Amino acid sequence: MRTQDHPNNSPGVPMKFPVWFENFQIKYINPIAVPLARITPGITVITHRGRKSGKTYETAISAYRKGDTVAIMLAHGKTNWVKNILAAGEADIRLGRRDLHLVNPRIIAAGTDDASLPRMARMAAKRGVGVFVADIA
C-alpha cells in the first residue's frame, strides 16, 4: 500500500512516514514505548478510550505545551488515537509529573501558521504536518 492510499493519510493531516515504518512502529516500537515514556524525557503518555470498544488505551507521544494548550504533531497522519479523542472530546495526559485532563480537541491543518501554537508545533504545521491541539481543563 502506498502512503497516499493509507487510511491515516487525510486532507490537512498528511502521513509523512512510509507505510512499512508505520507497520514496524505499531508492531515493535509501540509496545515498549509506553513503559519507557514514563522515564524518558520528551515522551509522554496520552490516555484515551476506544470510540467503538470503549476500552482504555495508552499511546506514547511527544507533546508541547503553551499556556493552557497542548499540541502534538501528527507526522503519522490521522491515527486511531486521534480519531478516538476527537470522538470522545477528551483525554488525559501526563506532562512531566502532572496529570492533565484535555478537552476541546481539534486538528490544525498542515500549512497553517497559528501563533497560539507552541513553537515546535507551529514550525511543524508550517512545514506540512497536521497538529492535534487540545485545551487543558
Task: For the regions a language model picked out, list residue spans one by one.
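Short, functional N-terminal and low-complexity linear motifs
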Residues: 12-13, 48-53, 83-87
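A subset of signal/propeptide-processing and intrinsically disordered low-complexity segments
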Residues: 1, 17, 96-99
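Short beta-strand segments
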Residues: 41-74
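Short, flexible segments with low predicted structural confidence
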Residues: 25-26, 56-57, 113
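Alpha-helical membrane-targeting segments
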Residues: 3-44, 83, 119-129
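Short, structured beta-strand-loop surface elements
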Residues: 6, 76-137
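Solvent-exposed, flexible loop/coil residues
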Residues: 28, 32, 36, 61, ...
